[in-house]
From Swiss-Prot:
Catalytic reactions of this protein: sn-glycerol 3-phosphate + NAD(+) = dihydroxyacetone phosphate + NADH + H(+); sn-glycerol 3-phosphate + NADP(+) = dihydroxyacetone phosphate + NADPH + H(+)
Tagged with keyword Methyltransferase: no
Function: Catalyzes the reduction of the glycolytic intermediate dihydroxyacetone phosphate (DHAP) to sn-glycerol 3-phosphate (G3P), the key precursor for phospholipid synthesis.
Record gene name: gpsA
Keyword Transmembrane: no
Organism the protein comes from: Rhizobium etli (strain ATCC 51251 / DSM 11541 / JCM 21823 / NBRC 15573 / CFN 42)
Residues that coordinate or bind sn-glycerol 3-phosphate: K107, G135, K190, D243, S253, R254, N255
NCBIfam families: PRK00094.1-2, PRK00094.1-4
Name this polypeptide is given: Glycerol-3-phosphate dehydrogenase [NAD(P)+]
């Protein structure tokens, strides 16, 4: 079945996602952004060198700066950072078709409420099915046509499989899930752990420490996901372990680079920190973990370091001298 798909958000990920769906050739795809001049340039030049240098966008991809462009779309993907999603949903939600499925592509938790993004979408758009797309995929890799696999989760498997079929292509494969909680929290919490791994790298304390953080961080993620109603198996999949390994080891990751800067003792630009999803997620996850009585020492340490409440050397000592326990 052919779908009409709108991707909202003309940053790197939104543009890459729109391009790879358009290349699959099964759906009519429109990339929707707020900047009329940018969208006109993308339409005429088929290049978005500011975020995806040298990558030619497909001729079949349409562009629009009009909110009304989402009208008639059967699938609408919100591909902007988590803290900007609520405003975007309110702006574009007025124009959605009554049967449109909405998909959040952000990896974060609402900072003020601690809610998942699907909670926000269901609150703002109560008449629409809501799904989440997450997993190990850098925008540049997706746009270049490098093999990438991610997860898409909806309330029902029928909807999840429909979305996976509509969005997947030769080089971009989606796995269907019904665990929206696990898929979202994996995407949010791995950013915190990527910052921790960046601190380790910036501090120069070895790959063994990074491996320990990945393994023990995965245990933290699993405890948190299960406590919030998700499934432990999801944490071991693409949206959990897969995304964690990618983000904690690749310098394409903003979160890893932010952690490296912290580890080196560099003065971090507040504007840079504002773009790092893990910087938001750390404080929210640490607060929620305390409310749920969940042990998350790595997440707590990252939150305290970012807030300036804990020195990195003290954080390392605290983690290494915790009471001995079973794995």
């Amino acid at each position: 079945m052919s779908e009409k798909i709108a991707v909202i958000g003309s940053g790197a990920f939104g543009t890459a996602l729109a391009a790879v769906i358009a290349l699959a050739g099964r759906s009519a795809v429109t990339l929707v952004g707020r900047n009329p001049s940018l969208m006109a340039d993308l339409k005429s030049e088929r290049l978005h060198d500011a975020v995806l240098p040298g990558i030619v966008l497909p001729e079949s991809l349409e562009f629009s700066a009009e909110a009304e462009a989402v009208a008639g779309a059967s699938i609408v993907l919100f591909a902007m950072p988590s803290q900007a999603q609520a405003d975007a949903v309110r702006q574009y939600g007025l124009y959605l078709s009554k049967d449109a499925v909405v998909v959040t592509c952000a990896k974060g938790i609402e900072r003020t409420t601690g809610n998942l993004l699907t909670d926000m979408l269901e609150r703002e758009l109560p008449d629409h099915p809501v799904a989440v797309l997450s997993g190990p995929g850098f925008a540049a890799d997706i746009a270049k046509g490098l093999p990438t696999a991610m997860a898409i989760a909806a309330d029902g498997m029928e909807t999840a499989e429909r979305l996976a079929q509509a969005i997947s292509g030769r080089t971009f494969r989606l796995y269907a899930s019904t665990d929206r909680i696990g898929v979202q929290l994996g995407g949010a919490l791995k950013n915190v752990l990527a910052i921790a791994c960046g601190i380790v790298e910036g501090r120069g304390i070895g790959e063994s420490a990074r491996a320990a953080l990945i393994a023990r961080g995965l245990a933290e993620m699993s405890r948190f996901v299960v406590a919030k109603g998700g499934q432990a198996d999801t944490v071991r999949g693409l949206s959990g372990l897969g995304d964690l390994v990618l983000t904690a080891t690749s310098h394409q990751s903003r979160n890893l680079r932010f952690g490296i800067a912290l580890g080196r003792g560099e003065k971090t630009d507040p504007a840079h920190g504002a773009l790092v999803e893990g910087a938001f997620a750390a404080s929210v996850a640490s607060r929620l973990a305390a409310e749920l009585s969940i042990s998350m020492p790595i997440t707590d340490a990252v939150s305290a370091i970012i807030d300036g409440r804990l020195d990195i050397s003290d954080a390392i000592e605290q983690l290494m001298t915790r009471p001995i326990t079973t794995e």
